[in-house]
Regions:
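Active-site-proximal alpha-helix that buttresses catalytic centers in soluble enzyme cores
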Residues: 6-9, 14-80
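Short glycine-rich phosphate-binding loop at a beta-alpha junction
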Residues: 56-62, 171-178
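A mid-sequence, solvent-exposed acidic-amphipathic segment
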Residues: 141-170
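Active-site glycine-centered loops adjacent to acidic/histidine catalytic or metal-binding residues
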Residues: 16, 89, 180
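Phosphate-coordination/substrate-recognition cap region in phosphate-metabolizing enzymes
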Residues: 47-124
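Short glycine/proline- and acidic residue-enriched helix-loop micro-motifs
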Residues: 113-151
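Acidic, low-complexity terminal tails and accessory targeting/binding regions
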Residues: 2-9, 94-106, 115, 165-173, ...
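Short active-site segment of divalent metal-dependent hydrolases/proteases
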Residues: 19, 183-184
Length: 237
């Protein structure tokens, strides 16, 4: 393959649709809730908003909620041909060990106590919080199965690099990647500390450009595709 045919790869990182565990404010890493009715509706809206984008490839984590969302996008897409979903274990959400399925407030209260802070604001000021919440969870987990920051980032960034390498030929292109809120936050925070990653809505899009082995964050938590799709549905009625 000639290097002159390599081009930039634009990654469309999409968070999966809302699940029953999201709605119940339960910690959801490798445990896997089904999409709610609202989750499916918003995923369809975002998919319609993305329907005129020609994707070179489509990927998701191997967890059901991401696969279901990705299949909705592929079904609604009109611009791409023969788009087949590739499921990657390396794109899974963080594994939270004993906190899987637990109420989110319990996990984060434990982490706040461990870090000796009283609020997320204080945690952000004192720590690289995206990194330390992950490490704290791993330390607090008596099962010793929860993932620490380095373990997560190693598998996730390897997956992203592999995806970029696989799709940079023939002048690159646009790639759909349906993953998880925690993973998107970690990726964005790792690549560029200037973005606020606190909010990461279900079915939102965060865009990253990969060129010559380097990553650049272009946008984060973009809901305009969902808004566009919702407007398209009104017109179709």
């Amino acid at each position: 393959m000639s290097s002159k045919n390599k081009g930039k790869v634009i990654l469309y990182l999409m968070r999966h649709g809302q699940t029953i565990l999201n709605k119940a404010n339960r910690t959801q890493g490798w445990c896997d809730g089904v999409l709610t009715k609202e989750g499916i509706e918003v995923a369809v809206n975002a998919s319609l908003g993305l329907s005129d984008i020609k994707f070179k490839a489509a990927y998701s984590s191997d967890l059901g909620r991401a696969i279901k969302t990705a299949r909705i996008v592929i079904k609604e897409n009109k611009a791409s041909t023969n788009l087949k979903l590739k499921e990657l274990e390396g794109l899974r959400e963080v594994y939270f060990g004993k906190y899987e399925g637990e109420h989110e407030s319990i996990m984060f209260n434990d982490i706040m106590k461990f870090l000796n802070v009283s609020s997320f604001k204080e945690a952000d000021e004192k720590y690289d919080f995206q990194k330390e919440y992950c490490n704290s969870c791993a330390i607090l987990d008596e099962t010793k199965e929860a993932e620490d920051y380095n373990s997560v980032m190693k598998r996730v960034m390897k997956s992203l690099n592999d995806i970029c390498m696989a799709n940079s030929h023939d002048n690159g292109g646009k790639v759909l990647i349906v993953v998880h809120g925690g993973i998107i936050r970690l990726i964005i925070d790792y690549l560029d500390k200037n973005f606020n990653v606190r909010n990461m809505d279900n079915s939102s899009i965060s865009k990253i450009i990969c060129e010559n082995g380097s990553f650049k964050v272009e946008s984060v938590n973009d809901n305009s595709y969902s808004d566009k799709g919702k407007a398209m549905k009104r017109v179709m009625k």
